[in-house]
Design a protein with these regions (language model features):
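P-loop NTPase motor domains
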Residues: 1-210
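Conserved ATP-driven motor cores of ASCE-family P-loop NTPases powering translocation/secretion/packaging/pilus
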Residues: 202-245
C-alpha cells in the first residue's frame, strides 16, 4: 500500500498504472473466454517489471485484441500506446515514478505463501475458489485468516486485498434493499486493515444489505493507517456506528 500522505501525483500515477494493467490482463482473459489465466499477480508483476520484454509482449498482444465496441477498441489502443511509448520508454519518468507499486507487487509474489494463494496455476486446473458475488447471492460463511504472526506486513496486505475484493462485490450487487440477502462482515483487529477507502462500505454498505462489525483495541488506533485523513476517518467510523461497545 502507498503511504496515504504520498503526493497526489504519485498516488494518481500508481492508480492509473494498476487500472491499465488490470484491463490488459482481464481483457486478455476475456478474449479467450477464460478467467484467471492472465489475471494473476505473477502476470501483473510481468507487466509492471517487463523482465526480458515479457511485459511488452503481453501489452502488444492486448493491443491487437478486437474490442466488443468501438469505444473499447480505442481504449485498448490508447492503453497499449501508453505502455509502449510512455511506461516502457527508455529512461521513462513514468516508470521511475511508479517504483512504489512495483515494490509492493514484488513482495507479494516473492512470498511463497501468498504466491500460491493468489496465483492459482491455470494450466494445472487450479481456479479461484472464493467467489464473493456468488456468496453474496446465495449466502454462506467465509472465514479468512491473514496469518499476521507468520507474514507480518504481507498479512496486512492480504487483508487489504480481501476487503477490497469483497467491497467491490458488494457495490455491484443486483437488486435493491428489499430483495438483497442480508450479510454481516466481521473484521477483528480492524486497525490493522483500516484505510479511508473503507469509508464507502460504512456509509453505503447498509443500502446493499451488508452490515460491518469492527473490533479494535482503541478507536484512536484506526487512524494509524489513514495519514492526514486518519482523524476524519475515525470520526466517520464513530458516526456510522449504530452501537459502540
Amino acid at each position: 500500500m502507498l503511504n496515504p500522505d504520498s503526493p497526489q501525483y504519485f498516488k494518481d500515477l500508481s492508480e492509473q498504472l494498476v487500472r491499465y494493467t488490470l484491463k490488459v490482463l482481464k481483457r486478455l482473459d476475456k478474449s479467450e473466454g477464460v478467467d484467471g489465466k492472465y489475471a494473476t499477480f505473477i502476470n501483473m508483476n510481468t507487466v509492471l517489471q517487463n523482465p526480458n520484454q515479457d511485459g511488452r509482449k503481453l501489452v502488444t498482444r492486448f493491443g491487437q485484441l478486437k474490442g466488443e465496441t468501438d469505444a473499447e477498441q480505442k481504449e485498448n489502443a490508447d492503453i497499449a500506446s501508453w505502455f509502449i511509448n510512455e511506461y516502457y520508454a527508455e529512461r521513462s519518468k513514468v516508470y521511475e515514478n511508479s517504483s512504489g507499486i512495483r515494490a509492493q507487487v514484488s513482495k507479494v509474489i516473492a512470498n511463497r505463501y501468498l504466491r500460491g494463494i493468489l496465483n492459482p496455476d491455470f494450466d494445472k486446473g487450479q481456479r479461484n475458489q472464493i467467489d464473493f458475488d456468488e456468496h453474496l447471492e446465495k449466502g454462506g460463511v467465509i472465514c479468512i485468516c491473514t496469518a499476521q504472526g507468520m507474514m507480518r506486513d504481507l498479512g496486512k496486505f492480504l487483508g487489504y486485498f480481501i476487503i477490497l475484493q469483497l467491497q467491490s462485490a458488494v457495490f455491484r450487487r443486483p437488486g435493491n434493499e428489499d430483495n438483497r440477502r442480508a450479510h454481516f462482515l466481521y473484521i477483528d483487529e480492524f486497525q490493522t486493515y483500516s484505510t479511508p477507502g473503507f469509508s464507502d462500505m460504512l456509509t453505503q454498505g447498509r443500502s446493499y444489505r451488508v452490515a460491518s462489525h469492527l473490533a479494535t483495541q482503541a478507536r484512536a488506533q484506526i487512524a494509524m493507517g489513514g495519514g492526514r485523513d486518519g482523524k476524519n476517518f475515525v470520526e466517520l467510523v464513530s458516526t456510522n456506528a449504530r452501537n459502540l461497545i
